[in-house]
């Protein structure tokens, strides 16, 4: 919970996390501020991250579990984390919240956005056939290859996603077009800095769109976002196209009527 709760200074003022964002409320309100995070699930997910961090010898990891309809965050973990009771032993890198502030090229998880955008723009259906897909293509003198040479050359759009095909994803993105794909990603919050309950929020790195950028973005390379924005984007696609605002604070649930995808 260290990144969620945040830190206070020597004068008991919040300087990060919920402690900073809700500093006044925490000092003045009579009732406690209730979070959406489930402590048991938070513990289990943290343990899994630590286990796989050891297996893969990674420097850090993050995970978010969110209700796709309400936006309530059930678990949000960033590793490494820290113990505020042992401040002198904390390295600065442990303060960094990878789940909300870390900006990454997230790779193949973007292929879901590519297919969703194509379906939303009505240029592709799940059973649309793509034939004679090569194992590699050239763009501006650089090669884009399939990660798996066993991927068949004839696939439907749905099968491209299932098999995680790079070239197939590029072909789908080409049907969408640069402006439509860019606008779709902005609409679902993947390319825009989003409002959240804590201030530690990352900003996707801006870039210039072009044919090659469209191609690589279709499979999640050359385009960045945060895990929190990824969760928001997936939630919108999963819940039927309704906008959702990720939150850590329990509120009275309201029906989500802002449909942003067709």
Task: Label the predicted regions.
Residues 1-3, 29-33, 59-62, 126, ...:
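Envelope-exposed proteins and targeting segments
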Residues 63, 67-108, 113-262:
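Beta-lactam-recognizing serine transpeptidase/beta-lactamase-like catalytic domain environment
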Residues 1-31, 35:
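Small/polar-residue-rich segments within soluble enzyme cores
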């Amino acid at each position: 919970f260290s990144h969620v709760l945040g830190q206070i200074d020597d004068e008991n003022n919040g300087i990060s996390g919920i402690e900073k964002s809700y500093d006044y409320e925490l000092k003045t309100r009579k009732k406690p501020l209730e979070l959406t995070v489930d402590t048991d699930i938070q513990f289990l997910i943290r343990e899994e991250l630590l286990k796989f961090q050891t297996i893969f010898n990674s420097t850090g990891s993050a995970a978010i579990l969110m209700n796709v309809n309400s936006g309530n965050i059930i678990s949000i973990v960033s590793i490494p984390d820290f113990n505020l009771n042992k401040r002198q032993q904390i390295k600065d890198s442990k303060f960094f919240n990878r789940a909300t502030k870390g900006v990454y090229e997230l790779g193949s998880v973007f292929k879901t956005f590519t297919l969703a955008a194509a379906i939303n723009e009505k240029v592709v259906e799940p059973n649309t056939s793509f034939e004679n897909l090569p194992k590699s293509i050239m763009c501006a003198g650089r090669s884009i290859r399939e990660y798996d040479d066993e991927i068949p050359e004839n696939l439907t759009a749905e099968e491209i996603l299932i098999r995680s095909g790079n070239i197939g994803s590029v072909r789908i993105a080409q049907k969408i077009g640069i402006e439509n794909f860019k606008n779709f990603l902005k609409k679902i919050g993947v390319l825009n800095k989003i409002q959240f309950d804590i201030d530690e929020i990352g900003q996707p790195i801006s870039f210039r769109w072009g044919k090659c950028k469209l191609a690589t973005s279709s499979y999640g390379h050359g385009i960045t976002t945060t895990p929190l924005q990824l969760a928001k984007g997936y939630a919108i696609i999963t819940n039927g196209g309704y906008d959702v605002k990720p939150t850590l604070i329990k509120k009275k649930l309201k029906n989500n009527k802002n449909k942003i995808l067709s």
